[in-house]
A protein has these predicted regions:
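Conserved RNA-binding domains used in RNP assembly and mRNA/RNA metabolism
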Residues: 3-63
């Protein structure tokens, strides 16, 4: 997922499926506050549970 795609979900409650560092998939319902870019790490979603790296997001849908 790219930053412009992720910005469509700002301020919304979403269901986000992402992989962890071990490759396991997790699905969480989150509220997305911001999309940021961190040098050397890449883009991430700032959500109410934690930051989620965009390169690990496999699917996202608004609730």
């Amino acid at each position: 997922m790219l930053i412009p795609e992720a910005k469509n979900y700002l301020g919304k409650d979403c269901s986000v499926t992402f992989s962890d560092r071990h490759g396991s998939l997790h699905t969480h319902n989150v509220h997305i506050y911001d999309v940021t870019f961190t040098p050397m790490y890449g883009a991430c979603l700032v959500a109410d549970i934690d930051d989620i790296w965009l390169e690990r997001v496999t699917s996202i849908s608004a609730l």
